[in-house]
Amino acid sequence: MTHRSFRFSIERPVEYRFTDTRGGPRLQGRTVNISSTGVLFRTDEKIGVGRKLEVTVRMAQLAPNAPEIDLRLLGMAVRSGDGWVAVQARKYQILRPEGIAA
């Protein structure tokens, strides 16, 4: 029996870049859902399965007067279709917007 991670339907802005090429642009998208094993997001780009990505999700404030945080993950595209990609996370990191680890 396989374990499936619970998915949270969260729509947030995404910025991503390919880590298997040098000097590529940072691209934009929007999350569809997030789980403990990865993220599914919409994008205008065609992303092939196997591509390595760094994905930064702009999270909302967790509490009044709290700083906003970003969720950054390193992973690989495991499924993709017309206008979407599923990225399996290899590593997660929570950052303050300035890029400093929380």
Task: Show which residues each predicted segment covers.
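Structured alpha-helical
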Residues: 1-102
